């Protein structure tokens, strides 16, 4: 024990830097002392920047007396021996100033409550007046009687319902306060089917006596009226027998319709178009400006007759179609525009070639007064197939010209007519008149024959000349029999031209003759 205490003392002295007498050089603790010296020297070398302070030998001795040799050996082996000695104070490392804490983000202002969306605008803002009787539930309504004697009122209105009816009677009297609303929306009509309603009527009698009181009126896309084995009659002014607007559809089968008032067509398609189909039906008008057909939509007649006894047989406005098959279309114009069938467009709806059409197949067209066709202020296509045309032979069968603008048919001098005429298995007799701001493109095909002549005349309003005025194509097997000298822009002949002593003068000055 005494030996251990002495060794510990020596260790403490070594720590304090006190020299060890050589007398103890052979002591068993000498290797330890040497190791301590080496460790101390290494520590001093590593920390050359800071000079160790003066050692207090008394404190070191007292500390060393408390150690045993095993303690020192253990510390040396573990590498923690230096922790038993007083160490020089480490240099003070300046701590960086703490970063200021970020200011809290301001709380976002609450978003304002969105304003309520306005109610969607109604697709149709139609003034249709009142209804004495209204059906808005699907069902069958046979043998009913519907009457209205008040102004601006429908006798029966079918709205958003699918119904069928047989043997009904619908009677309307009383005038409309504004004929525009009766024409555009069906206000004051005897029967109004509207807003997607469907009405299938058979053996039904519809009659009206008021001004602006249409017989049957269909309004809006998705609306459908079917009249079968029925009669429709109107006696007031501006009272069409059958009318559709806003893309409504109507079909008449085995039905008779008549009007007697002014401006009351038998068949009318008005604002934004629609479709009317007539099968095995008969239509008559007796009033002035009461055309057999007046359409800004599509009308098809099959096995039917139309007779306008005091005005034009038909007026086709804008890019729309009138088609006849196995039918008769008859007119007797008594006013200032002596033509039986007129094709024209508003100046803001001028069509393109072929979009406005008149088609007749296996049919008869009769004009009791005036020429047959006037094409003005539009682009149109007329197709005749195996159809009989009856008119005054001294008048042109086709007049394709501008106009003076008095009817609102475009601007004078720039409102020419542009027509494509197609003959299919057709014999046509009559002349064609075209003015200098208009043109005719004529195709004689499928063994057709044209007996007539074509004349180009100056535009009455002195408009700038169109680049072409008359181009004639004669297919193989078809024939042109000249009845007078003619002027054309070009002729393409794959068939036969019989000059009959007449000539054809081309735009380049060439004169063709037999």
Outline where the language-model segments fall:
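Signal peptide processing junction and immediate N-terminal pro/mature segment
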Residues: 21-37, 62, 76, 80-82
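Gram-negative bacterial Sec-dependent N-terminal signal peptides
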Residues: 1-25
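Acidic, proline-/serine-/threonine-rich low-complexity intrinsically disordered repeat tracts
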Residues: 41-54, 87-121
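All-beta strand scaffolds that present successive hydrophobic residues in beta-strands
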Residues: 138-144, 162-168, 198-203, 224-229, ...
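Post-signal peptide N-terminal segment of secreted/secretory-pathway proteins
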Residues: 144, 148, 154, 165-217, ...
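Surface-exposed loop/turn positions within long extracellular repeat scaffolds
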Residues: 466-472, 480-492, 505-506
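N-terminal segments that cap or nucleate solenoid repeat domains
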Residues: 81, 116-179, 504, 511-514
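Extracellular beta-strand/beta-solenoid scaffold signature
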Residues: 121-130, 150-157, 179-192, 210-218, ...
